[in-house]
Swiss-Prot record:
This is 6,7-dimethyl-8-ribityllumazine synthase. Belongs to the DMRL synthase family. 5-amino-6-(D-ribitylamino)uracil binds at residues 22, 56-58, 80-82, 113. Pfam families: DMRL_synthase. Pathway: Cofactor biosynthesis; riboflavin biosynthesis; riboflavin from 2-hydroxy-3-oxobutyl phosphate and 5-amino-6-(D-ribitylamino)uracil: step 1/2. It catalyses: (2S)-2-hydroxy-3-oxobutyl phosphate + 5-amino-6-(D-ribitylamino)uracil = 6,7-dimethyl-8-(1-D-ribityl)lumazine + phosphate + 2 H2O + H(+). Catalyzes the formation of 6,7-dimethyl-8-ribityllumazine by condensation of 5-amino-6-(D-ribitylamino)uracil with 3,4-dihydroxy-2-butanone 4-phosphate. This is the penultimate step in the biosynthesis of riboflavin. InterPro entries: LS (IPR034964), LS/RS (IPR002180), LS/RS_sf (IPR036467).
Length: 153
């Protein structure tokens, strides 16, 4: 029986990051966490490209273009959606999640979901480098591992 695992070595891997501008005071921290983690695991900063989009809803299209380009081993999607007083939150969260998941399945490229979906600003801040760690960093680890798992198949 074969057991296939992915290591956390990012040397010579190329990463695309799609980051939403809306709620950038949170997303900047997610992006910094992702880049720092990729570099700490061997990626070169010159092998990391970041595309900024208006908001979480726009992430899937740019993620798809990056994944289809053949330039990237993985794409990391970062954003923050904070619940407000309308149903807009539900639509944005659902469509971003479905779109990002579909890109990975359609292209065969690991596309990592790093869009925070929180009830309030405090929860978002906690997940961007305080009490609950940095989800951008966690997504970078997931991207590295998935690339290496796929290489082992």
């Amino acid at each position: 029986m074969a057991i296939i695992t992915g290591n956390l070595v990012a040397t010579e891997l190329k990463f695309g990051i799609v980051c939403a501008r809306f709620n950038d005071f949170i997303n900047d921290k997610l992006l910094s966490g992702a880049i720092d983690t990729l570099v700490r695991h061997g990626a070169s900063e010159s092998d990391i490209d970041t595309a900024w989009v208006p908001g979480a809803f726009e992430i899937p299209l740019v993620a798809k273009k990056m994944a289809e380009s053949g330039k990237y081993d993985a794409v990391i999607c970062l954003g923050t959606v904070i619940r407000g007083s309308t149903t807009h939150y539900d639509y944005v969260c659902n469509e971003a999640a479905k779109g990002i998941g579909a890109v990975s399945l359609q292209t065969g490229v690991p596309v990592i979901f790093g869009v925070l979906t929180t009830e309030n600003i405090e929860q978002a801040i906690e997940r961007a480098g305080t009490k609950a760690g940095n989800k951008g960093s966690e997504c970078a680890l997931g991207a590295i591992e998935m690339v290496n798992v796929l290489k082992g198949l």
